[in-house]
């Protein structure tokens, strides 16, 4: 296209400043790995939900299958291209879509525990859960929309499936599951919301989360200080999205020595002025596959530069004496890298501002907003710290790229989802018993939502773990960030958000 435009009458020639190419072999492998992960994760979630919630779990499973059908139907109707990040978005939706049903079922179980009949418990359970479901999903939806607005390419695909998944999940949980349960009850039949193994799970739990908050402050502070130290001394492994350059994933027909490849490429990556550019070579998956990163001639504006670089790359790789195939390549110009970096920073900042304002409007107290934002900043810092500390240690890529920013925004959405559920219960308890202190109310809210927190976090983490293991090398770093985020987000919703809210409230209401 650049050549076509150059041959026309434009006053300035066009050149490609950002490009991503995926070879047919890698594309086929990625989609196969993604679909396998999708089916495996779906089966695991279906079994777990049925084992935990019995008959009601089967109703939730039917709704989940309908939800997936809706997602694929909407994607097909808008002509969306199914990419690996898009598949990851669908798989993540599987884990998160269970959350609405878990919220509803736990409220129904509470109503039944308080002595209500099954029909009344179902009605009141749904009515009580609506507020938490809407608030939790709106905050996640807002971050997904921001991700779509600031993201490019595959990241938009991930955000698109996430937005569609959130909306269809709400419909499936609120309408389809209730339709199935109500139809059964109207026929005079009963339905169980627990099995013998799970009917007493998380009952009579009374953990003093608030009383031990100083321990959690110290623990989080130590981890963050270590992380900041690593960020200062070691830094982060920025990908070409943020610094500009070229990357190639190359597969050889036999194991290859990374240092030999690096030396060979450094010897040929010399421009017309005699300036040499180094190449970074790392094993990418199996020992016969490497990822090559270089800034060689990335500043050049000559339209023939790409062909020159490809020729030099072929010359260097030929010295290995092995047959090879370029599985994928990516090029990001320095100007585009700066734009991506700015967009990434603003997307995170804008997400935090929007969430602060939404929590302020919904809960009418700035202390709730502050508690939420501090916990989110805590989550982001710890994920960054983990990527800095373990960069070069773990046997897979921990690059900071657009996918990582997508992971950070997803973590923000997931974590605030968790936090809002607790805040909503705190608000409910404060309205029902205004004489009870905030300390006791916060503990009651955390303990009463512990079952929901456990089930949602476990299903989401298991889904992510399955993708991490079987989804292929391309998506490992992205999934690792999400896995760390789920663990840290769950921790902060239990031990940071509510305690910050409590400590910044001058008096108990």
Where are these regions (language model features)?
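A structural signal for conserved, well-ordered secondary-structure elements
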Residues: 1-509
């Amino acid at each position: 296209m650049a050549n076509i435009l150059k041959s026309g009458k434009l006053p300035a020639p066009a050149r490609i400043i950002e490009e991503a190419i995926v070879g047919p072999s890698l594309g086929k492998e990625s989609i196969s790995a993604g679909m396998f992960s999708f089916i495996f994760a779906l089966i695991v979630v279906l079994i777990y939900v049925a084992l935990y919630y019995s008959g009601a779990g089967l109703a939730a499973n039917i709704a989940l299958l309908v939800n997936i059908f809706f997602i694929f139907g909407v994607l097909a109707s808008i002509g969306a291209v199914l990419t690996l990040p898009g598949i990851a978005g669908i798989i993540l939706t599987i884990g998160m879509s269970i959350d609405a049903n878990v919220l509803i079922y736990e409220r129904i179980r509470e109503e039944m525990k308080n002595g209500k009949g099954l029909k009344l418990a179902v009605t009141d359970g749904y009515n009580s859960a609506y507020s938490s479901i809407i608030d939790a999903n709106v905050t996640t939806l807002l971050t997904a929309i921001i991700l779509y607005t600031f993201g490019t390419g595959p990241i938009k695909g991930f955000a698109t499936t996430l937005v569609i998944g959130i909306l269809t999940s709400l419909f499936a949980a609120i309408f389809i599951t209730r339709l199935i349960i109500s139809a059964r009850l109207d026929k005079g039949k009963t339905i169980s919301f627990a099995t013998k193994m799970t009917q007493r799970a998380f009952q009579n739990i009374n953990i003093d989360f608030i009383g031990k908050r100083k321990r959690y402050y110290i623990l989080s502070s130590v981890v963050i200080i270590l992380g900041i130290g690593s960020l200062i001394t070691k830094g982060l492994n920025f990908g070409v999205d943020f610094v500009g350059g070229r990357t190639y994933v190359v597969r050889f027909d036999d194991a290859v020595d990374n240092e030999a490849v690096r030396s060979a490429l450094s010897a040929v990556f010399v421009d017309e002025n005699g300036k040499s550019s180094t190449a970074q070579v790392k094993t990418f998956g199996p020992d016969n596959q490497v990822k090559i990163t270089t800034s060689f001639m990335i500043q050049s504006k000559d339209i023939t530069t790409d062909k020159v670089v490809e020729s030099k790359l072929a010359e260097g790789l030929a010295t290995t004496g092995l047959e090879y195939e370029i599985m994928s390549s990516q090029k990001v110009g320095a100007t585009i890298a700066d734009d991506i970096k700015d967009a990434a920073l603003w997307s995170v900042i804008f997400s935090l501002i929007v969430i602060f304002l939404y929590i302020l409007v919904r809960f009418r107290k700035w202390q709730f907003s502050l508690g939420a934002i501090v916990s989110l900043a805590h989550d982001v810092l710890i994920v960054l710290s983990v990527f800095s500390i373990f960069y070069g240690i773990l046997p897979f890529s921990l690059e900071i790229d657009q996918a990582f920013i997508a992971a950070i925004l997803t973590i923000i959405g997931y974590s605030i989802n968790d936090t809002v559920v607790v805040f909503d219960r705190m608000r409910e308890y404060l309205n029902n018993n205004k004489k009870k202190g905030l300390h006791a109310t916060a503990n009651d809210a955390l303990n009463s939502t512990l079952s929901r927190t456990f089930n949602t976090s476990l299903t989401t983490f298991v889904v992510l773990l399955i993708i991490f293991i079987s989804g292929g090398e391309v998506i490992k770093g992205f999934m690792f960030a999400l896995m760390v985020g789920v663990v840290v987000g769950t921790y902060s919703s239990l031990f940071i958000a509510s305690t910050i809210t409590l400590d910044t409230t001058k008096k108990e209401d």
